[in-house]
Amino acid sequence: MSLNMFWFLPTHGDGHYLGTEEGSRPVDHGYLQQIAQAADRLGYTGVLIPTGRSCEDAWLVAASMIPVTQRLKFLVALRPSVTSPTVAARQAATLDRLSNGRALFNLVTGSDPQELAGDGVFLDHSERYEASAEFTQVWRRLLLGETVNFNGKHIHVRGAKLLFPPIQQPYPPLYFGGSSDVAQELAAEQVDLYLTWGEPPELVKEKIEHVRAKAAAHGRKIRFGIRLHVIVRETNDEAWQAAERLISHLDDETIAKAQAAFARTDSVGQQRMAALHNGKRDNLEISPNLWAGVGLVRGGAGTALVGDGPTVAARINEYAALGIDSFVLSGYPHLEEAYRVGELLFPHLDVAIPEIPQPQPLNPQGEAVANDFIPRKVAQS
């Protein structure tokens, strides 16, 4: 099975070390463009663009990278409860059309009550997933070309429709990650690829089995992906030394503050990440070559595969044997590490190198009439 390898655009900051300004660098458009172009040339399938108040806006960043890349896809967040499904569907179709079919979407429900409150969202965990399920149902139907009337608990639309369809049919693929039962049920029923953070293989296997069974109950098959950091070097010793350097500027106070911030979230996945290290520096290798040091201060994905190219490739193939076909990777700093992964790791894997998409001709059309419909040719009698 060929593997889809993704990289990451660090719109929330980048540098050589975690938890310090030492060794950091400006993350401006030029720098993000360098990373995107490197990923494009090295054969990555796409890039994940993060979302939230600590990041630049993912949609604007993705749109700005379209003209400077050729085959790279953009995995961009959909935010139920923050955006209406109709507006999100229009945005999704536009991004797909302007990028010639290079748009992918990642459903993000949110987990930090403080940040959500700042965005005007006051739903609890279960309510957010109810709203997300309704949002996704309407979003998908719109991209399928339906005119949608929907009267749910959280979402209400009447006569919603898209005038401009996406390039990818039936619609651009929808990704999603969540560890709670309600999250897995949503994934099983509505999404195309279920993402997990980088837990030890036995825990990932358990997750995959649960989601696969739930999807089968809905008569569906679902793909799987995993989100990991990577520290790959020419030797295992060099890789482990690089891992230690990454957290060499962390002090106990910074770790404690970060863990306190994570504790206020209601994300089951974040709780599982935190439990891998319990905020302590010792015993960070939680599974062969799987290191939890990143999660001491970074929210979300908090583990890294560490080793030389053949060693990291062996660990990746262990995950692939569980049914994972997509790997969303990152490393610090992201420009240099994109090259290291491409040069030291890719040769040891069966990497699916994306082709440059051929331009998709769009049907000629006149201006929309009354902002309501696209004019068509009148049949001659």
Curated annotation (Swiss-Prot):
UniProt-listed Gene3D superfamilies: Luciferase-like domain
Chemical reaction(s) catalysed: an alkanesulfonate + FMNH2 + O2 = an aldehyde + FMN + sulfite + H2O + 2 H(+)
Alphabetized UniProt keyword annotations: Flavoprotein, FMN, Monooxygenase, Oxidoreductase
Alphabetical list of Pfam families matching this protein: Bac_luciferase (PF00296)
UniProt-listed Enzyme Commission number(s): 1.14.14.5
InterPro entries for this protein: Alkanesulphonate_mOase_FMN-dep (IPR019911), Luciferase-like_dom (IPR011251), Luciferase-like_sf (IPR036661), SsuD_RutA_monooxygenase (IPR050172)
GO MF annotation list: alkanesulfonate monooxygenase activity
CDD domains to which the protein is assigned, alphabetical: Alkanesulfonate_monoxygenase (cd01094)
Any one Gene Ontology BP term: alkanesulfonate catabolic process
Functional summary from the UniProt entry: Catalyzes the desulfonation of aliphatic sulfonates.
Stored PANTHER family: ALKANESULFONATE MONOOXYGENASE, ALKANESULFONATE MONOOXYGENASE-RELATED
Additional observations: FMNH(2) which is absolutely required for this enzymatic reaction, is provided by SsuE.
Quaternary structure and partners: Homotetramer.
Family the entry assigns: Belongs to the SsuD family.
Designated name of the protein: Alkanesulfonate monooxygenase
Species the sequence originates in: Escherichia coli O127:H6 (strain E2348/69 / EPEC)
